[in-house]
Amino acid sequence: MQISNLRHYPTFADTIADRGWHAWWTESGVPIENYRAHVHLMLEKDGIPAALVAHDDDRYIGSVLIIENDLDERPDYAPWIAALWVDPDFRRQGIAAQLITRSRAHIAQLGHDTCYLCATADKRPYYLKQGFTLLEEDVAGLDVFSISSG
């Protein structure tokens, strides 16, 4: 398995969009085409936004997005680790942790000291175990975390 910037493996863009939209956006009213366009923007330049993809050659395993803002209620926090996804067959193998580590490194290379993440409260134990600090609870129904990028 390797973790690559989506810019180097653009064939995974639609898969990343599909997984993310089905996991978090189906009930939002946002069309999948809009979410797909958001992911395709990550192919255009280095920096933020970006996507990292875990894969075994041409087999998708998981992905994570690095974006400017993942929570409208907290516009001052940036950048964010978002849409962390590992396909069910590959879970509990440390892949999500590796995607987080690579995201943090990418964010650090861009000169940011801290990154943020939001998740439902049931995910809190996982993110605390990964070294995140809980900043706030129940912001639009989500926990808000931070972690050093370095």
Language model: regions and residue ranges:
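A short beta-loop-alpha structural element at the N-terminal edge
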Residues: 1-16
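Residue-level recognition of the GNAT/N-acetyltransferase active site
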Residues: 87, 120
